[in-house]
Amino acid sequence: MDKKIKLAIIGFGNMGTGHTANIMDGKCPEVDLVAICDINPKRIEFGKEKYPDANITYFTDAIEMLDSGMIDSCLVAVPHYDHTKYSIECMNRGIHVMCEKPAGVYTKQVREMIAESEKHPEVVFGMMFNQRTNPVYRKMHELVHSGKYGEIRRTNWLITNWYRSQAYYNSSDWRATWAGEGGGVLLNQCPHQLDLWQWICGMPVKVQSKIKYGKWHDIEVDDDVTTFVEYENGATGVFITTTGDGKGTNRFEVQMDGAKLVVEDDKLTVTEFEVKESEFTKTNTEVFGSIKTHNLEIEIEKTNPQHIGVINAWAGKILHGTPLIAEGAEGLKGVILSNAMHLSDFLGREIELPFDEDLYYEELMKRVATSKKKENVTATFADTNGTYGGAKL
């Protein structure tokens, strides 16, 4: 019998349920799901009813499960504040860990998690950045980093197809609260795009944001964000997102010295310049001269494995030493971006990176202190397929 990892899942909510379904459907052939933990007894009963013949042991205490000796790997899919807590508990026991996005709520706790992982090199630590498996973004990353088109001039990402109604925010007592979730659209939906943005374009050095909290919904946290950034080479970028647009847009544009790259409607368009702009502007003699361009035919892989691909790559790393989709330490960069965006709006000014992480934590805790606990909320769970807001094939 081929060797498999012995997996546990902590958190049997929307994401944990989705991962379980993929594994039980046989889409992760090197994964044996042996344990599931959730503090809600109703979720345990749901699992037993859904998979009555499965050899899965259920727990309501995560530490008891981690100490059971049954598992060698764990997928952490709990509310955001506890991502680092349970990932560290896994590392301390030599258990391989896959952390759902975001890596944490604030950078200080993510740095602690990464520092702990460095003490345990035997542990395979991965991040659930499933959009890195999307072939259009992988190709965009390849082209931007090839050096063929020179430096980035400008980046723009309009990612407003994250629409959520009030029912979504009412589905859990922790959701969309400072104390329970630690943020809104930036921390819940946009970790995917913030990761891709920095993965493809690099990290900015300055951030300035205008954020609205509960603009479109009855919530405490952000549901409308406009951010301006500057990069070390002088390039600029804009990032706009919301969960309030009834019909949103997902358009990511990177303007370079020698080309323009756009991802929209699940397609990558590359407009190549016959002469780089930096050369053309110096040598052109026509008053209204313009650069000649042509569109490239870009061959894109047809497979887009998303969460399944991330889990299979993680199992492959554990069993065979093959590469991960995203190392665990990669989770820090997106949290830096979301924290910087929040801090800019909290203080009403531009933020330079690296920023004062203690100050961010203080500002966050002010909001946690006044966060209102939701009363009489019945947890509601739903199929998350098709809700990820990224390009799909």
Predicted regions and their residues:
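Beta-strand-loop-alpha-helix segment that lines the small-molecule cofactor/substrate pocket
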Residues: L66-S68, S73, P79-R132, G147
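Conserved SAM-binding strand-loop segment of SAM-dependent methyltransferases
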Residues: N55-A62
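Short, conserved SAM-binding/catalytic segment
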Residues: F46-A54, M113-H120
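Predominantly a Rossmann-like dinucleotide-binding segment in NAD(P)-dependent oxidoreductases
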Residues: G11, V123, Q131-I219, G348
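Glycine- and charged-residue-rich phosphate/anionic-cofactor binding loop of Rossmann-like
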Residues: E30-V34, K317-L332
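N-terminal Rossmann-like dinucleotide-binding module
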Residues: M1-P52
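Contiguous beta-strand/loop segments that form the cofactor/metal-binding neighborhood of enzyme cores
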Residues: N188, L194-E277, E301-H320, L324, ...
